[in-house]
Amino acid sequence: MAAIKTREIHYTAPDGSALIGYFAAPETDAPLAGVLVAPEWWGRNEYTEQRARELAEHGYAALAIDMYGDKKVTTHSDQAYQWMMQTFEDPDTIVDRATAALNTLAAQDEVNAEKLAAIGFCYGGKVVLDL
């Protein structure tokens, strides 16, 4: 298993939302393919962060993204539903926030911006398809 490094990365969506991603990458100097990891409707939780770490262990740089702002996360379905539906109110919200995350990933020194991919889980799957 490769040694990895992790950090939080603050970035801003076009609507002004302060977003906080979780970045994981192998300890290497070579630029790597980058993978965006879009979360389920719960927000950027431990599950999403673990997927980013696993990708890093397999040689990728990964960014688990924040779709709700300020790293909001919940375990309550009513709250998750409310936050998710807020991102549907303006058709540009999902694309703008995901694009901001993708640009943030591409800008990291560890990332080869010519080799990017995205994966998502549940709500995150929609985010990736909209991207």
Question: At which residue positions do the language-model features occur?
Answer:
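Charge-dense, helix-prone N-terminal extensions
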Residues: A3-T6
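Serine-hydrolase catalytic machinery in alpha/beta-hydrolase-like enzymes
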Residues: E8-E110
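Active-site signature of alpha/beta-hydrolase-fold catalytic machinery across serine-
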Residues: Q50, D130-L131
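Gly/Ala-rich beta-loop-alpha elbow adjacent to hydrolase catalytic centers
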Residues: G120-G124, V128
